[in-house]
UniProtKB/Swiss-Prot annotation:
HAMAP family: MatK. InterPro entries: Domain_X (IPR024937), Maturase_MatK (IPR002866), Maturase_MatK_N (IPR024942). This is Maturase K. Transmembrane segments: none annotated. GO terms for molecular function: RNA binding.
């Protein structure tokens, strides 16, 4: 426990105490709205889209008055001291954007110091910024693992939890009080949290501030959780001495620092602390995380209930056990970042000849397989009006006013982006269907614009129309290798993982 406390104090050594005066500085709101500092955006007596720093100060003052807070609960007309309620919401948004800039200052400084320290090292890992780098990691590690925990990170039930988490880093009590008043004063803040969704529950109107608070909450959770993981992979269980995992124990004897004869249960429990699990891996994207291990089912159940108690004790959150799933990798497909990932066995039969006898040896080989979730992806295309819910291409009527080159460029860019992201799929047939939908939807859009048929339009455009829908890797491979070669066919069918993808395409982001 003392070591844990020292770790917390070390990581929180950068604490800032003087943020509150920055809230009343005009240039902060200039930074928030990306305006030049030589042009004031907070002017009195301007239009509805112009802001007044004086009114912002008055709003902050009013939020500290208890009678004003009591009136806001009843939605009284007297509470609308701006004359128009939509203006009041506008100024709440201004304060949230400005406050987001202020609370990001210490973490921006931490990031700068981290990057400066990183530049001094020889080894650089810029490619790890790509979200595609997760899947080569899966291919390398998951073949040797047995179980995984699929964890839906619980969202804060109350925004007060976010404020309390932030107070460990920001010691400016005035700023924290203002943030707390602001969250309570904003009349629609209860609607910002939707229980049915994980990370998309925050209001788009105050996205920067609330996403910062949520990301900070996740960072706080991961910093403590991963520290505990590094200390010991085995969770000591004093009340379940009869359920010690003997198989797992004998498999890990090589990782003991010192082996000695166990004379009693107490000695055994002490030596158990020496075990380290080198096969415990943690991955997260947005509100979903994966904890994979080579351990047994009993060990994974220990982790599950440990996480539930951890959230309950540290964050006062009650996480339902069904938000954490325990699955065996050999029997379950992992639904993560738009892919179905699984470990399947490929049978390799080898014939062995010994004198007059011959044998057939069946060698099962594990392979990491990734396929595209085609049904949700077609649903996203249907929602964007590229096809029907059954996958039949339709024209994009809202684009018929554009130039032909712009229409083709838009469809081609969407097709290339989706193919770029889903290039890691082990089976390309799903991607061919998506290309077919977008290509025919483009043809129908152009034919509708020119009041012609699709057949006649495709005949007039010829092969040049299809070139817009070639993906980058297809163009490169077609220049290097002929399509009829065996090497080229294997590369066309194999997965491609790119190291320049930092986010999921909007059409692929259907979670």
């Amino acid at each position: 426990m003392e070591e844990f406390q020292r770790y917390i104090e070390l990581d929180r050594s950068w604490q800032y105490n003087f943020f509150y005066p920055l809230i009343f500085q005009e240039y902060i709101y200039g930074f928030a709205y990306d305006h030049g500092l030589n042009k004031s955006i907070l002017l009195e007596n301007a239009g509805d889209k112009k802001y007044s720093l004086l009114i912002v100060k008055r709003l902050i003052t009013r939020m500290y008055q208890q009678n004003h807070l009591s009136l806001s609960a009843n939605h009284s007309n007297q509470n609308d001291f701006f004359g128009h309620k939509h203006k009041k919401n506008l100024y709440y948004q201004i304060i949230s954007e400005g406050f987001a800039v202020i609370v990001e200052i210490p973490f921006s400084l931490l990031l700068i110091s981290y990057l400066e320290a990183k530049e001094k090292k020889i080894v650089k890992s810029h490619n790890l910024q790509s979200i595609h780098s997760i899947f080569p990691f899966f291919e390398d590690k998951f073949l040797h693992l047995n179980f995984l925990l699929e964890i839906l990170i619980p969202y804060p039930i109350h925004l007060e939890i976010l404020v309390q988490t932030l107070r460990y880093w920001v010691k400016d009590a005035s700023s924290l009080h203002l943030l707390r008043f602001f969250l309570y004063e904003y009349r629609n803040w209860n609607s910002l949290i939707t229980p049915q969704k994980s990370i998309s529950f925050f209001s788009k109107r105050n996205q920067r501030l609330f996403l910062f608070l949520y990301n900070f909450y996740v960072c706080e959770y991961e910093s403590i959780f991963l520290f505990l993981c590094n200390q010991s992979s085995h969770l000591r269980s004093t009340s379940f001495g009869a359920l010690l995992e003997r198989i797992y124990f004998y498999g890990k004897l090589e990782y003991l620092v010192k082996v000695k004869t166990f004379t009693n249960t107490q000695d055994f429990r002490v030596i158990l602390w020496l075990f380290k699990d080198p096969f415990l891996h943690y991955v997260r994207y947005r509100g979903k995380s994966i904890l994979a291990s080579k351990g047994t089912s009993l060990l994974m159940h220990k982790w599950k209930y440990y996480l539930i108690n951890f959230w309950q004790c540290h964050f006062s959150l009650w996480s339902q056990p069904r938000r954490i799933y325990i699955n065996r990798l050999s029997k379950h497909s992992l639904d993560f970042m738009g892919f179905f990932s699984s470990v399947r066995l490929n049978s390799s039969v080898v014939r062995s000849q010994m004198v007059e006898n011959s044998f057939l040896i069946d060698n099962p080989i594990k392979k990491f397989d990734t396929i595209v979730r085609i049904i949700p992806l077609v649903g996203s295309l249907a929602k964007a009006k590229f096809c029907t819910v059954l996958g039949h291409p339709i024209s994009k009527s809202v684009w018929t006013d554009l130039l032909d080159s712009d229409i083709i460029d838009r469809f081609g860019r969407i097709c290339r982006n989706l193919s770029h992201y889903y290039s890691g799929s082990s089976r390309k047939k799903s991607l061919y269907r998506i290309k077919y939908i977008l290509r025919l939807s483009c043809a129908r859009t152009l034919a509708r614009k020119h009041k012609s048929t699709v057949r006649a339009f495709l005949k007039r455009l010829g092969s040049e129309f299809l070139e817009e829908f070639f993906t980058e890797e297809e163009k490169v491979l077609s220049l290097i290798l002929p399509r009829d070669s065996s090497i080229s066919r294997g590369l066309y069918r194999g997965p491609f993982w790119y190291l320049d993808i930092i986010c999921i395409h909007d059409l692929a982001n259907y979670e």
